[in-house]
Amino acid sequence: MEKFEGYSEKQKSRQHYFVYPLLFQEYIYAFAHDYGLNGSEPVEIFGCNNKKFSSLLVNRLIIRMYQQNFLINSVNYPNQDRLLDHRNYFYSEFYSQILSEGFAIVVEIPLSLGQLSCPEEKEIPNFQNLQSIHSIFPFLEDKFLHLHYLSHIKIPYPIHLEILVQLLEYRSQDVPSLHLLRFFLYYYSNWNSFITSMKSIFLLKKENKRLFRFLYNSYVSEYEFFLLFLHKQSSCLRLTSSGTFLERIIFSGKMEHFGVMYPGFFRKTIWFFMDPLMHYVRYQGKAILASKGTLLLKKKWKSYLVNFSQYFFSFWTQPQRIRLNQLTNSCFDFLGYLSSVPINTLLVRNQMLENSFLIDTRMKKFDTTVLATPLVGSLSKAQFCTGSGHPISKPVWTDLSDWDILDRFGRICRNIFHYYSGSSKKQTLYRLKYILRLSCARTLARKHKSTVRTFMQRLGSVFLEEFFTEEEQVFSLMFTKTIHFSFHGSHSECIWYLDIIRINDLVNPLTLN
């Protein structure tokens, strides 16, 4: 406890106190839209809802905020809000969108500065590659094969609005910004749906997504902070990846309150974290806690996490939100992949010398597959096929040129293959390629009022090459002169790319409208 109090005092000097004045700078809103604003000239900004906005409206919003008592009245009397101008729906929608995006940019600045000044990044080789989504899968392949039990955790909710405001107090003590945050939380009518369901983080109105995503990440980082801190204190190894989470100033006060509710709880639970083979992974409102310990230890972990959420965040967590399974008897949906460690082992045959004995070794395998149903459903929502997977034309693209249509379909196909290159079974991906290829042919045939057969004969190999993925090109070069290789075979080579930093909209069904 004394060690943490000293660390907490050290982190106070890194806090940023004045970020609110940045809301009066026009370039902040230009950054929010990733579009340049040139003085007073009207510049069209295409927001997420495809509506045109002018930089003149940004200037009007800044002038309104400069006027005395406008923001104070907006916070104290939200029903009589004149800042967002509810009398005009267009102004109200634009002001709420641009102000929330600008506020999200401003509150992210202290965290970004802390990450830039964090020395741990320089100590980790190829740190940029660790930002890839796929970088976690080689880690799982290497570590999960030796573990026994898996805990599926749904990060608890709901949480009170004031707790979210307090979470930002640890990052910044700019009081006006905190008041403005309260205004946004109580202003948006869809706030309750965000907290009530983790799926709705992808279904929010797009103009609010950045702000609410930042608040959600702040809440989750606070939830994980306690686990990371205890593991760092009990482990002999230094966790270089937890530095950005250890920026809190009143954690010692919470620990004192925690100790009053449970005397000696801190000392009794520290041994939970002494297992060097305990691994924690979080994704999309869910978390996985894998360990080599016994079933009794995992049950104690479950009880501890339930009590921790109840007394650390002051709300009740249902025990059913934490499921315990043996690793060999369970599978988990992770970033679009269905991952598991099958009971059947993989036979590996080794031979040290040419005429020596053959040594058969059986080892576990970390299996990653792709389910066809969610991806076909995504293509169906995007109007590339029916719900049963029957390809259809894309009428809204018939006004484009032939090469633009080919390029769009080919790019979607390559992106899906690129993201799911780690799948051990490629049959699902080839089914998606068939759907996209035939949908493209039907779109072109509809544009030229012809048949699919005629267009396929006219384009020939050019049409097929557009859907030729990078992975298949690599395999074709490897196996052209050695063995017969079929792209539609059952090869199970897994390739993980380190340039994927986000989930594609077609990959993640929740992002589709």
Curated annotation (Swiss-Prot):
Superkingdom of this protein's organism: Eukaryota
GO biological process, one term: tRNA processing
Keywords noted in UniProt: Chloroplast, mRNA processing, Plastid, RNA-binding, tRNA processing
Pfam families: Intron_maturas2, MatK_N
Alphabetized InterPro entries for the sequence: Domain_X, Maturase_MatK, Maturase_MatK_N
Subcellular location per the Swiss-Prot or TrEMBL entry: Plastid, Chloroplast
Function: Usually encoded in the trnK tRNA gene intron. Probably assists in splicing its own and other chloroplast group II introns.
Protein name: Maturase K
Source organism: Zea mays (Maize)
